[in-house]
């Protein structure tokens, strides 16, 4: 998937250069993940390893369209952030997002991020909810995989410090001793080029692994 390509790209050319144990998480319309262990892509039995977006973080939460309950994607994706604000605005909640909602019938994740930067209470609430859920998912990765680095990419990563400062604080506070001390959580450095660069790196690795007789 795109997150698998992204982790290869960031490892080869971006934030993860020289880091062989790392996780890439894309937070955009959905939430996905790619994992490197010992410098090699972790795919699992069916090629689906790393799906942080479908980790349950609230056993009493809403049902996602994937069929799971309370998974990270419900709360932390750009779609989930927007849906939370939409529901509150539909219920009459006061917010600087009101004009956009009344005009368009909905808001976007980017609208919410912009409003949060301006101190809007509803937008900050939606972002805090997103951070808590994402942190819970990342902590599962931290305690199972013990990575050196987590790179966050996708549209929501463009929220910058609004996302990264509280996210780091929660993860570092809750990580067990021996897991968080040397862990870095960083934004992507390759931006929208991450997928195509990752595809190139995947092809390079495939060629590397071909038998010399070919």
Question: Whereabouts are the PLM-identified features?
Answer:
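Acidic catalytic patch
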Residues: 1-4, 109
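Active-site glycine-centered loops adjacent to acidic/histidine catalytic or metal-binding residues
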Residues: 2, 28, 199
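Short glycine-aspartate micro-motif
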Residues: 21-26, 32-34, 65, 151
């Amino acid at each position: 998937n795109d997150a698998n390509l992204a982790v290869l790209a960031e490892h080869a050319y971006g934030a993860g250069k020289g880091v062989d144990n790392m996780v890439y998480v894309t937070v955009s319309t959905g939430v996905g993940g790619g994992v490197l262990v010992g410098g090699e892509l972790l795919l699992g039995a069916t090629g689906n390893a790393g799906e942080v977006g479908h980790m349950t973080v609230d056993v009493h939460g809403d049902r996602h369209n994937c069929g799971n309950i309370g998974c990270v994607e419900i709360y932390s994706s750009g779609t989930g952030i927007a849906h939370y604000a939409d529901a509150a605005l539909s219920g009459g909640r006061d917010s600087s997002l009101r004009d956009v909602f009344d005009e368009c019938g909905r808001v976007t994740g980017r609208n919410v991020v912009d409003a949060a930067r301006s101190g809007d209470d509803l937008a900050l609430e939606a972002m805090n909810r997103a951070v808590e859920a994402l942190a819970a998912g990342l902590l599962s990765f931290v305690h199972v995989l013990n990575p050196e680095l987590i790179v966050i990419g996708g549209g929501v990563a463009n929220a910058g410090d609004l996302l990264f400062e509280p996210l780091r604080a929660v993860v570092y506070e809750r990580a067990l001793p021996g897991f968080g001390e040397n862990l870095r959580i960083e934004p992507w450095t390759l931006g929208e080029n991450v997928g195509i660069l990752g595809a190139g790196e995947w092809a390079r690795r495939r060629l590397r692994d071909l038998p010399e007789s070919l």
